[in-house]
Amino acid sequence: MTTRREGERRAGSDASGPVRFSDRVVLIFVDGLGVGDGGRDDPTRTYGGDLFDWLRSRASWQPIDASLGISGIPQSATGQTSLFTGRNAQAVLGHHSTGFPGPVLREMLREHSLLKTLIEHSRSAAFLNAFRPLFWELSEAKRWTLSASTVANLAADLPFFTLDDLASERSVYQDVTNGDLRRRGFDVPEWTPGHAGRVLARNVGRFDFTLFEYFKTDKAGHTQDRESCESVLQELDGFVRAYLEAVPPGTLTLLTSDHGNIEDLGTRSHTTNPVPLMAWGPGETDALAACADLTD
């Protein structure tokens, strides 16, 4: 694999080419989506769709453990590190850690990043989220202090996607509609959730493994505002449905989270609820059967 300075790396030209294996896996990581009790404080029951209404969802899914044997409320840094490495980050630290990974978790990601492991086994992989120009203005050292997904991608020495890639529909921004970018003054097209889902589907055929991260769920959950939470769930529902309608045959798609949040309007914090593991495509039954917690 060609190595260039991180500040010069762009994903649009480096990550193209045919997939060398027939099997493809896509992981849609949704921050802060737990399996609630279905009560009046649970917007997954009232948002107007059924994909994330666990009592009515026709998707193949099961709850998995996000606590990993550690007491307290699960948090982002440890949950995501466990998810992206397959190792129990909570047990390594002895507690749940919020925000971005600290030195110990960064080292775990540096050594055991799923993306890095795939590359070492001659598989193609991509973290398909588009990044704002500010990312390339940061020093390399600063980039290593960002989110677990960013560190996992850095550990694999994979390129990052730009807003030019977004405009060319080679990547998707984290909010899927580009509304956040437009409010910041960037000249990017406004997308519907359905259009963004179809863009993701068109691109996953280029890689053996694709990661996409959506975190508006966690932000909405912290507001405890029903209207905001229901709107985000509607958006995510439309995005995932459109993606599933357009995804290439032979693709196994997984959707999961790092901890609960949006499913309980009664608290501003995260929850101790299990998180969903949803699966579509060849091998979905085996994938669900093999997973009991974030490390699986």
What spans do the regions from the language model cover?
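Feature captures the catalytic ectodomains and active-site-proximal regions of enzymes
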Residues: 2-296
